[in-house]
Amino acid sequence: MNATPAIVMPSTDEEIWRYSRIAERFDDQQQRLDGLRRFFSFSNEITPREFDGYARPLLQRTLAYAWAPRVEAAQRADFEQRTSAWLGQGYVIRDQDAQGNWQPAPLRDHYFPVLYTQSADQPALPYGLDLAGQGARQATLARALEPGSMAVSEPLQIMDAEAGRPAAQAGGLLMVAPVFAERGPDNAPSGYVMALLSMRQLIAALYEDIIKPRLAGVPASARCWSGK
């Protein structure tokens, strides 16, 4: 038994308009993230307060924003020490496994740890999380290496950083954009800004704008579901 809704492409002007609204919402996310990228690109140094002040107004329809600078292996100890003093709390570049357990990141040539993060509520992107050590996230970074580029991850499970279990917003997409304020080795990005998007919110928008209007006035017994 296959109980998936039949997918029908837009065929009327009204349906095309509704699909365009979904595209516009995604374009809006890209524009907001690009604004955050430019904020970093044209600033010499950004404080946690400045990041929070810029990112917080952008949080509508976005779970979190974050900044992850590139840290070379030789810089790690000094970076962790300075960041702990700067943030006023212990800071370690770290990895999280599939069960939500944390451990210090092993030696790597370089790291992209979350340094600043801003969210309206949990889940946020945890401080110190090394994107270079997270398979799907690292693959996303690898697709955004050129100035002006962006990449979106495959659907990810979002972990509650404090509880060590899947968060209420269990599914999400990570949109990343490279920053080239200072060219790294081999012209690599100096860091990434990122937005964490809720799959639940995206699906809700799809339902409200596309599916619900199609079902309006259609008897339940006549609604289009494939069943073989």
Model regions: which residues?
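Generic detector of short, locally flexible boundary/turn motifs and exposed helical patches
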Residues: 30-35, 116-118
